[in-house]
Amino acid sequence: MTEQVQLDENKLIAERRGKLDHIRQACKANGHPNDFRRDSLAGDLQAEFGEKTKEELEELNHVVAIAGRVMAKRGPFLLIQEVSGKIQAYAAKEVQKELKDKYQGLDIGDIIGVKGALHKSGKGDLYVNMEEYVLLTKALRPLPEKFHGLTDQEMRYRQRYVDLIVNDDSRHAFIVRSKVVAAIRNFMVDKGFMEVETPMMHVIPGGASARPFVTHHNALDVDMYLRIAPELYLKRLVVGGFERVFEINRNFRNEGLSPRHNPEFTMMEFYMAYADYNDLMDLTEEMLSTVATSVLGSDKMPYGEHTVDFGGKYARMSMLDAIKQYNPDHAEIQALTYEGVKDRDLMVSIAKSVHVDVESFWTCGQLLEEIFGETAEPKLMQPTFITEYPADISPLARRNDDNDFITDRFEFFIGGREVANGFSELNDAQDQDERFKAQVNAKESGDDEAMYYDADYITALEHGLPPTAGQGIGIDRLVMLLTNTHTIRDVILFPSMRPQA
């Protein structure tokens, strides 16, 4: 903000504070009344009366009470915005004079209540005749001059309340988000899943490969970790006999900010006994088609230059096949087999040839995943399940019966990004013990995202986890797709931001 703009804004704020002082003195009150009751919403009025003629409304003489924020002043008309939409209020000359005398006039951003008969203008717009009115809240700060929204992206995120006032697209995105969460919850309950809540603070972080946030519990005098995933607790519940469970909640990962990543994000994670990863893929197809149709009225929608189709069966291919498909001219990749993937020198050579910056502690499976992420993932625009993830990057997934180098795991991609991760669960306590130990070794070798050893979880497995499949779906990324937005900050109400200087 330039110095001149700041001076102009300070002047406007001072003027509005002066008006509020005038109101308090004139009304002998605090200037923030709370006795006006609204009985109608703009959207409902438009739906019920929008098709009626001007003459029909005059004959009907339907009196309504509306309330909202003044977004524009056009001659005798005020444009009032509330949660369902916008509607005009008409101030006759005598009312305009009263507003000036009582309130020193209304400003853009003020919140008012209006009561009067519903009419229609010559242009066909509904409006309420201001027969009774009250200033409910005086806006002391001016809204951005451009009515269509903020132009400063960072300010939109730091002052989301202003963004929501002036930006229709932003409001729409968060309305869609709320509906998506509700639709997923209803779908899961209808499928016989029980919603549960598991701890947000863990003594041992687990359930995903990520760097955790650390906090300290003063009463217990122990360090604790904000959860990176609820997985191990949810599977403990399956051991306990709750055969279908789900949770919609926050996860926290102490990692970087990007258009795809926010350190605090929302996941829907669920587990179902007596199922495998194929059942999960089938359920995901049904869920996403149902959610899209329920929220947006169609299972087909635009995303950038593409039309994404959530209906029907989704593509399924192994990670190795996907790499080959999107690198048709790379001879070493075309000749690659799982035996070749086990050759670390070969994998390092291939990774470097496709511009992957290789870390010294990466396993062969990690190298394969990085090659996939660099060359194939961005091209997966339509719904696609990528399967056959190596066991060394899937420490909680069940090994494949025919090839123990890979697991019965998939990740779900759409719009060029991962949206979900699921697998048949590892329920062999001895195998899980060995994989936890391998993760500890990886952490000691420099992999900050490797998992910790969780002895109690091993104890739970020793009591017996039935054959189980589980999956996590990123709510934020799913909402990005359904709202055709390309940065995660546009679908998180208050995203993480660097402190202002």
From Swiss-Prot:
Protein's UniProt keywords contain tRNA processing: no
Cofactor note: Binds 3 Mg(2+) ions per subunit.
E.C. no: 6.1.1.6
A matching Pfam family: tRNA-synt_2
Binding site for Mg(2+) 1: E411, E418
Family annotation (InterPro entries): Aa-tRNA-synt_II, aa-tRNA-synth_II, aa-tRNA-synth_II/BPL/LPL, Lys-tRNA-ligase_II, Lys-tRNA-ligase_II_N, Lys-tRNA-synth_II_C, NA-bd_OB-fold, NA-bd_OB_tRNA
UniProt KW keywords: Aminoacyl-tRNA synthetase, ATP-binding, Cytoplasm, Ligase, Magnesium, Metal-binding, Nucleotide-binding, Protein biosynthesis
Residues annotated for Mg(2+) 2 binding in this entry: E418
Subcellular location per the Swiss-Prot or TrEMBL entry: Cytoplasm
Keyword Manganese assigned: no
Cofactor section: Mg(2+)
Assembly description: Homodimer.
Family: Belongs to the class-II aminoacyl-tRNA synthetase family.
UniProt-recorded name of the protein: Lysine--tRNA ligase
Organism: Aliivibrio fischeri (strain ATCC 700601 / ES114)
Designated gene of the protein: lysS
